[in-house]
Amino acid sequence: IPEDRHKYGMVLDYDLQNNLILENYWKTRYTKGKAIQNKKTINENSNELIDKYDIRSGQGSSTIVRSMSGGNQQKAIIAREIERDPEILVAVQPTRGLDVGAIENIHNQLINERDKGKAILVVSYELDEVLKISDRILVMFKGQIVGELDPKNTTREELGLYMAGSKNTYNFKEGD
């Protein structure tokens, strides 16, 4: 899940259904033969994801994503990436610039994937987000790990001190 949803996450002038299969367009499920798209299956898949991930779009799966809110664009990216069923999901700034409702939705989706046994790596500058959805926090400063924290036993203030480079208690060992 890229940090810049417009530059790396979506093709803004494509409709929602084509954005939802960007990484999967070549799969047999979405094709008829070697080059022809199976529009019916693509549309059904899009409608399922729109419902499952609460993606709000004015014209359903035919909505041009440029016209959608940032929160709904982000939910579409999350839907697409989760539906690829990765063992490891890397989410960079997954809720940057989103409203409270969209943030809650995305956090719930990430937590659901974690609960299914998936590894979720979240890179975020949002301290509350890090504390809310993390099982383990590794803090970096100037490219180095400076702390390993348990979110249940740390505060925003302590986490902020590590992020600012004021604290460094992590002794990196080979193999960690």
Predicted ranges, named:
Residues 1-68, 147-150, 155, 161-167:
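Conserved P-loop NTPase catalytic core
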Residues 85:
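Conserved catalytic motifs of ABC-family nucleotide-binding domains
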Residues 92, 99:
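ABC-family nucleotide-binding domains
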Residues 104-116:
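Helical segment within the ABC ATPase nucleotide-binding domain
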Residues 124-125:
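H-loop/switch region of ABC-family ATPase nucleotide-binding domains
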Residues 130-132:
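A short, surface-exposed alpha-helical micro-motif characterized by mixed small hydrophobic
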